[in-house]
Curated annotation (Swiss-Prot):
(2E)-4-hydroxy-3-methylbut-2-enyl diphosphate binds at H42, H76, H130, T168, S227, S228, N229, S272. It catalyses: isopentenyl diphosphate + 2 oxidized [2Fe-2S]-[ferredoxin] + H2O = (2E)-4-hydroxy-3-methylbut-2-enyl diphosphate + 2 reduced [2Fe-2S]-[ferredoxin] + 2 H(+); dimethylallyl diphosphate + 2 oxidized [2Fe-2S]-[ferredoxin] + H2O = (2E)-4-hydroxy-3-methylbut-2-enyl diphosphate + 2 reduced [2Fe-2S]-[ferredoxin] + 2 H(+). Belongs to the IspH family. One of its GO terms (molecular function) is 4-hydroxy-3-methylbut-2-enyl diphosphate reductase activity. Binds 1 [4Fe-4S] cluster per subunit. The keyword Transferase does not apply. This is 4-hydroxy-3-methylbut-2-enyl diphosphate reductase. The keyword Oxidoreductase applies. Its EC number is 1.17.7.4. Pathway: Isoprenoid biosynthesis; dimethylallyl diphosphate biosynthesis; dimethylallyl diphosphate from (2E)-4-hydroxy-3-methylbutenyl diphosphate: step 1/1; Isoprenoid biosynthesis; isopentenyl diphosphate biosynthesis via DXP pathway; isopentenyl diphosphate from 1-deoxy-D-xylulose 5-phosphate: step 6/6. Catalyzes the conversion of 1-hydroxy-2-methyl-2-(E)-butenyl 4-diphosphate (HMBPP) into a mixture of isopentenyl diphosphate (IPP) and dimethylallyl diphosphate (DMAPP). Acts in the terminal step of the DOXP/MEP pathway for isoprenoid precursor biosynthesis.
Length: 289
């Protein structure tokens, strides 16, 4: 039998585990309807599993119409506007914001309030429109500049102070490149401060995933189609091992993917991929061999 290894370093990060525990605890102790603002995790199968337990996912429009309900805020965090709206509408918040994200929100809010009178610009290196980034921008009353890549650095006014932060799940390498590029553009005497706000539990998975991928002839990377972290990690996985395949469920694996038969098979995933899903993938592969 071809050896199959599930990566011990893959699976939910602490923030996601914490949010799911919050949801399950609330569902177990109360019969009251529990809503979640947005997918609790970017993994369709896990969302469906919790949905069967009673967790109902809603969007922001539906949230604005709720009255007297109970709503879980996921690990990504939310802007102040959501808390204000909840208070006005009698909505009870179950706050499962990741502690790492919460610290970052507070740091951004503090620096924004301390420097806005000086004309400083808060810049966030992250994915525009991502839930976490929306929550971070909200700490600056919507004024923060979001930068996805070096190509967007012209949005910054280099004659004014710059305060740079990063979305917690971005790569250290990418953040370092942004810091270097901004540094070379700053006008003499103008302040530039940068804060390393990247979660190490997530960042450390990048070198780990590469080492895991090279240790196996064939790799199946398991993640939801919506997972930003999954796309980033799979890119590193593929770079380390060209015979890496992205899948979102076990059913998509067909016998042809196993040809030629590999000496070993590795299964890994994103920070939004549950362990049980990777185990299902392993079982499916064994049935095909």
């Amino acid at each position: 039998m071809i050896p199959i290894e599930i990566d011990s370093g893959s699976g939910f990060c602490f923030g996601v585990v914490n949010a799911i525990r919050h949801a399950e605890k609330q569902l177990e102790k109360s019969s009251d309807k529990l809503y979640c603002l947005g997918d609790i995790v970017h993994n369709t199968l896990e969302v469906e599993r919790l949905g069967k337990k009673g967790l109902e996912t809603i969007d922001y429009d539906a949230f604005s119409r709720l009255r007297g309900a109970k709503v879980l805020l996921r690990a990504h965090g939310e802007p102040p506007e959501i808390y204000r709206m909840a208070g006005e509408n009698g909505v009870t918040i179950i706050d499962a914001t990741c502690p790492v994200v919460l610290r970052l929100q507070n740091k951004i809010k503090s620096r924004y309030e301390a420097t806005r009178s000086l004309g400083a610009q808060v810049v966030i290196y992250g994915k525009r429109g991502h839930a976490e980034v929306n929550g971070l921008v909200g700490q600056t009353e919507g004024t923060a500049i979001v930068i996805e890549s070096e190509e967007e650095l012209d949005k910054i006014d280099y004659t004014r102070p710059v305060i740079l932060f990063s979305q917690t799940t971005k790569s250290l390498e990418g953040f370092g490149q942004i810091i270097d590029s901004i540094s070379t553009r700053m006008q003499p005497g103008v302040t530039f401060e940068h804060h390393d706000t990247i979660c190490r539990q997530v960042a450390n998975r990048i070198p780990h995933i590469g080492a895991f991928a090279t240790a196996h002839e064939l790799v199946f990377f398991v993640a939801g189609e919506k997972s930003s972290n999954g796309k980033v990690l799979f890119g590193h996985c593929l770079a380390a091992n060209p015979r890496s395949i992205f899948i979102s469920s076990p059913e998509v694996i067909v016998p042809d993917m196993l040809v030629p038969l590999p000496a070993s098979i590795g299964i890994c995933g994103a920070t939004s991929t549950p362990r049980w899903q990777m185990e299902e993938v392993a079982s499916h592969i064994k049935a095909l061999l």
